[in-house]
Amino acid sequence: MASENGDKLELAFSAVPDPKPKKDWVILSLRVVAFFATASATLVMAFNKQTKGMVVATIGTNPVTITLTAMFQHTPAFIFFVIVNAIASFYNLLVIGVEILGPQYDYKGLRLGLIAILDVMTMALAATGDGAATFMAELGRNGNSHARWDKICDKFEAYCNRGGVALVASFVGLILLLVVTVMSITKLLKLNRI
């Protein structure tokens, strides 16, 4: 009718919010990759074991051998590493479920605030586990001549290589946790901006 009279058409937009909030697929996909990285770091280190027979002495012409086993349980830093990465994996899996199912149960943005706080705590925990394990890995690879600690990676190469793979996977997970943490805090700040 307005076009027949020569008047301009006016379009009105509804200020009613969308009843279904959009899922943030970037954060969700980063969480999935972080879950796989921390879970693989946990499993690789948890099953990291190498047994090797070594000659320690020779009596006459008979060698005296011993069997040594390198396991992650022998080092408290590696035990902490496995526990921390398992916690980070479980947390990421839990938050993936909350991100998929949780928006319908959100109460005044409490879910996003709680996730942001727990993201920071999980990232800090993962960083401490990675730092402790990296220190012990460096000590195992190079030793410490001042403290007279011998290196072991020349004797247990496969053990050290698998430990290195676990560390790399864990650091990838840590970097992804850092990115997810920054994104979740930014998302929280955008929602609270008036």
Swiss-Prot record:
Q: Which PANTHER family match?
A: CASP-LIKE PROTEIN 1U1 (PTHR36488:SF8)
Q: Which residues lie on this side of the membrane: Extracellular?
A: 46-77, 133-164
Ranges in a coiled coil: none
Q: Which organism is it from?
A: Glycine max (Soybean)
Q: Which cysteines are joined by disulfide bonds?
A: none
Q: What is this protein called?
A: CASP-like protein 1B1
Query: Which ranges does the record list as Cytoplasmic topological domains?
Result: 1-24, 99-111, 186-194
InterPro entries assigned to the protein according to its UniProt record, in alphabetical order: CASP/CASPL (IPR006459), CASP_dom (IPR006702), CASPL (IPR044173)
| UniProt topology in membrane | Multi-pass membrane protein
Q: How does it assemble?
A: Homodimer and heterodimers.
Organism lineage reads as: Eukaryota, Viridiplantae, Streptophyta, Embryophyta, Tracheophyta
Family, as annotated? Belongs to the Casparian strip membrane proteins (CASP) family.
Task: Name the UniProt key words of this record, in alphabetical order.
Answer: Cell membrane, Membrane, Transmembrane, Transmembrane helix
